[in-house]
């Protein structure tokens, strides 16, 4: 679009220049036209453009002066001064013409004025064009900068998202691995417990009963036992001890609870009955009152085997 505008401006400028050149050449033609050669048989004044009527009048005056007698001295002066007066009038006419010519601006001056206006207009257009180009350049640079910043921001977001995804994936894999190991450990302990049970079945029945009785008595005597210590005492694994205690609780051989600290608290049937009787008598009991009463109703002090037999 800008190229078409520039081509149109160039064509218009060329037309103006050609027009000015033709006008200047036309105005300068009368000044530079060579003088024509004088025609033969034509008076000098006629060749110089003097009117024919004036020439005839001058000829008549000349003949009258030749045929007339000599005039008085006072009358001769005016006759002699007449041509001079006409000559002065001719000079005045020529001076007036020269003054008129001086008042008319010549072609070069006219072309210079018109050229200055045109040049100022062209310079203004050129300045606007350069300004538009600079604005377009700045706009393009700004777009490029914004696109670069957007690409960098998107790249940073993608990088952060990838890091977060890897972190979540690592946590998930670690959790799965931990659960898998725990499950494998559980299966191993379960298999070992099954082997121990099979060994008991294959062994002597009296020995099995003795070991089981010792296991139960150890818990009753100590009242509060650490499961790991119990496993070491009977050469079992901790999970095997937990499974055996749960089995004994299920068949009613042992009564108690396993807390979250890895301990089993044994409570006898008599102690449970005393606690139940206390709750029934009081009706509604708070946890604080129950805890205070349980310390009196439930004995958590380890007792010896002899003491247990005496009490029984």
Curated annotation (Swiss-Prot):
| Signal sequence residues | none
Pull the Lumenal topological domain ranges from the record.
1-2
Q: Where is the composition biased (Basic and acidic residues)?
A: 110-163
What is the membrane topology listed in the Swiss-Prot or TrEMBL record? Single-pass membrane protein
Pfam families reported for this sequence? DDRGK
The stretches that face the Cytoplasmic side, renumbered to this chain, are 24-312
MF terms from GO for this chain are:
ubiquitin-like protein ligase binding
Query: A biological process (GO) annotation for this entry?
Result: protein ufmylation
Q: Where found?
A: Endoplasmic reticulum membrane
State a GO cellular component annotated for this protein.
Answer: endoplasmic reticulum membrane
- Work out whether the entry's keyword set contains Transmembrane: yes
* Keywords assigned: Endoplasmic reticulum, Membrane, Transmembrane, Transmembrane helix, Ubl conjugation pathway
Broad class of the protein's primary localization: endoplasmic reticulum
**Composition skew (Acidic residues), residue ranges:** 90-99
- Bias class Low complexity marks the residues at 52-85
Region annotation Disordered: where it falls in the sequence: 30-163
Which sequence ranges are marked TM in the entry?
Answer: 3-23
| This protein's record includes keyword Endoplasmic reticulum | yes
Coiled-coil segments on the chain, per record = none
Family, per entry: Belongs to the DDRGK1 family.
Q: What does this protein do?
A: Substrate adapter for ufmylation, the covalent attachment of the ubiquitin-like modifier UFM1 to substrate proteins. Required for ufmylation of Atg9; protects the nervous system during aging, possibly by stabilizing Atg9 and supporting its function.
Subunit composition?
Interacts with Atg9; the interaction is transient.
State what protein this is by name: DDRGK domain-containing protein 1
Organism of this sequence: Drosophila erecta (Fruit fly)
């Amino acid at each position: 679009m800008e190229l078409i505008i520039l081509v149109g401006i160039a064509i218009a400028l060329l037309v103006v220049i050609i027009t000015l050149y033709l006008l200047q050449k036309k105005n300068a033609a009368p000044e530079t036209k060579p003088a024509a050669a004088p025609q033969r048989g034509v008076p000098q004044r006629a060749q110089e453009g003097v009117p024919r009527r004036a020439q005839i009048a001058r000829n008549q005056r000349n003949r009258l002066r030749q045929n007339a007698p000599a005039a008085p001295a006072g009358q001769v002066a005016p006759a002699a001064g007449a041509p001079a007066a006409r000559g002065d009038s001719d000079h005045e006419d020529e001076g007036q013409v020269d003054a008129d010519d001086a008042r008319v601006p010549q072609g070069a001056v006219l072309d210079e004025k018109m050229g200055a206006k045109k040049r100022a207009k062209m310079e203004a257009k050129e300045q606007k064009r350069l300004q538009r180009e600079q604005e377009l350049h700045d706009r393009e640079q700004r777009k490029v900068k914004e696109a670069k910043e957007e690409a960098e921001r998107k790249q940073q977001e993608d990088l952060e998202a990838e890091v977060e995804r890897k972190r979540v994936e690592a946590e998930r894999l670690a959790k799965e691995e931990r659960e898998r190991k725990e499950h494998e450990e559980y299966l191993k302990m379960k298999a070992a417990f099954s082997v121990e049970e099979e060994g008991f079945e294959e062994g002597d029945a009296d020995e099995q009963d003795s070991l089981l009785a010792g296991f139960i008595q150890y818990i009753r005597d100590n009242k509060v036992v650490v499961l790991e210590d119990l496993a070491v005492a009977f050469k079992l694994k901790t999970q095997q001890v937990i499974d055996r205690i749960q089995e004994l609780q299920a068949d009613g051989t042992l009564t108690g609870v396993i807390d979250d600290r890895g301990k089993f608290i044994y409570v006898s049937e008599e102690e449970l009955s005393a606690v139940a009787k206390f709750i029934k008598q009081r009706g509604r009991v708070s946890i604080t009152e129950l805890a205070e009463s349980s310390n009196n109703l439930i004995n958590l002090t380890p007792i010896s085997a002899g003491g247990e037999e005496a009490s029984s």
